[in-house]
Amino acid sequence: MRGTMTRVMATGTFDILHPGHLLYLERSRALGDELVVVVARDINVKHKPRPVVPEDQRLRMVSALKMVDMAVLGSVTDIFEPVRALRPDIITLGYDQYMDENWLEGELRKRGLMARVVRISEREPCELCSSRQIVEKILKERC
């Protein structure tokens, strides 16, 4: 920790921003004094379809959000690189992110990184609160 400042790191793809992303980032920001967001690189998104919006545009959109103090692109080769560089006190995961909290904490410790991992389990209750739902609706109604 930097003095009394708590740095929180949120991670994600953030393809087609929606209220679910905002809730995740608001809840993450509430855990500390500073919110740093790591936006996934296009090439690294393998657990779901590749993003529709290119990484540079997703980074720009996330950077513009008022609850975000800083946003960076993730590393192409090492997911722990931004963690080493930015030294967060807390790393948050969204309710639907595939990574296991215990596994992540173990991997952090192996690398001498002491960040606590917190799952933001709250979900935004709306019809179009996932990028997948938005894409499906566009395909159904506009194509």
Curated annotation (Swiss-Prot):
<dbReference type="InterPro" id="IPR050385">
    <property type="entry name" value="Archaeal_FAD_synthase"/>
</dbReference>
<dbReference type="Pfam" id="PF01467">
    <property type="entry name" value="CTP_transf_like"/>
</dbReference>
<dbReference type="InterPro" id="IPR004821">
    <property type="entry name" value="Cyt_trans-like"/>
</dbReference>
<keyword id="KW-0547">Nucleotide-binding</keyword>
<dbReference type="InterPro" id="IPR014729">
    <property type="entry name" value="Rossmann-like_a/b/a_fold"/>
</dbReference>
<dbReference type="GO" id="GO:0003919">
    <property type="term" value="F:FMN adenylyltransferase activity"/>
</dbReference>
<keyword id="KW-0288">FMN</keyword>
<keyword id="KW-0808">Transferase</keyword>
<dbReference type="GO" id="GO:0006747">
    <property type="term" value="P:FAD biosynthetic process"/>
</dbReference>
<comment type="subunit">
    <text>Homodimer.</text>
</comment>
<keyword id="KW-0285">Flavoprotein</keyword>
<keyword id="KW-0548">Nucleotidyltransferase</keyword>
<feature type="binding site">
    <location>
        <position position="96"/>
    </location>
    <ligand>
        <name>ATP</name>
    </ligand>
</feature>
<keyword id="KW-0067">ATP-binding</keyword>
<feature type="binding site">
    <location>
        <begin position="13"/>
        <end position="14"/>
    </location>
    <ligand>
        <name>ATP</name>
    </ligand>
</feature>
<dbReference type="GO" id="GO:0046444">
    <property type="term" value="P:FMN metabolic process"/>
</dbReference>
<dbReference type="GO" id="GO:0005524">
    <property type="term" value="F:ATP binding"/>
</dbReference>
<feature type="binding site">
    <location>
        <begin position="18"/>
        <end position="21"/>
    </location>
    <ligand>
        <name>ATP</name>
    </ligand>
</feature>
<keyword id="KW-0274">FAD</keyword>
<comment type="function">
    <text>Catalyzes the transfer of the AMP portion of ATP to flavin mononucleotide (FMN) to produce flavin adenine dinucleotide (FAD) coenzyme.</text>
</comment>
<dbReference type="InterPro" id="IPR024902">
    <property type="entry name" value="FAD_synth_RibL"/>
</dbReference>
<comment type="similarity">
    <text>Belongs to the archaeal FAD synthase family.</text>
</comment>
<comment type="pathway">
    <text>Cofactor biosynthesis; FAD biosynthesis; FAD from FMN: step 1/1.</text>
</comment>
<protein>
    <recommendedName>
        <fullName>FAD synthase</fullName>
        <ecNumber>2.7.7.2</ecNumber>
    </recommendedName>
</protein>
